[in-house]
Amino acid sequence: EVISKVLYPEDKHYEGKMLRLKQHYFFTSATLQYAIKNFKKHFGNNFDLLPDKCVFHINDTHPGLAIPELIRLLIDQEGLSWEMAQRITYRCMAYTNHTVMAEALERWPVDMMKQTLPRIYMILEELNRRMCAELFKSYPDQWERIGHMAIIGYGQVHMANLCVAMSFSVNGVSQLHGKILQDSLFHDYWLLNNCLLYTSPSPRDTERS
């Protein structure tokens, strides 16, 4: 009851942060479990069809835990391989970024994630290991750059990096915002073509054109 009583409580102290993390997980997991249950009613266990029937909009990073949670559900409950679960999850996720300030991007302390969501952290570690191995092929020995792009680094889980790396579509909230994401905040991902980064025209953009 405490988890769902007050949405987004005060999080300037450790207990508040942990409660917020639990809320993020609670709501994303409930949503995904409902979606999978409904999908199976219509299409059985043919999860190759899931990306054609379900796209989950990660509107800012708050629901970003949907990424490791969907992988967990597909592996632990549905018996899929890691490779298939990761591929399906990538094709199901679309991320909208709302800030261009790196310091405002959501991060979670590794210790808190390990303590609160140990299985989710295991999945994040494996995603990070695989992603960094791929990044090393493009940026050999550029450890600072790879660390900047990593999902886990410097004692924190970087939710924006997770969302960019594991979403088939990434967009900003306006054309200018999207351009800034391409040119600065997510520039290294953009160079790799690791994500489909595009811009969403706002009503003002449309009026000017």
Predicted feature locations:
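Secondary-structure transition/capping motifs at alpha-helix termini
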Residues: 38-51, 74-87, 99, 134, ...
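Function-dense linear segments that define catalytic or interfacial modules
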Residues: 1-55
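Catalytic nucleotidyl-transfer cores of nucleotide-processing enzymes
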Residues: 1, 167-168, 173-196
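Polar, glycine-rich mid-to-C-terminal structural blocks
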Residues: 125-155
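Alpha-helical support elements that line or immediately flank enzyme active sites
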Residues: 29-33, 69-78
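Core structural elements
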Residues: 57-69, 92-96
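Conserved small/polar residues in nucleotide/adenosyl-binding loops
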Residues: 198-205
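Extended, well-ordered alpha-helical scaffold/bundle regions in very large, multi-domain proteins
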Residues: 77-125, 129
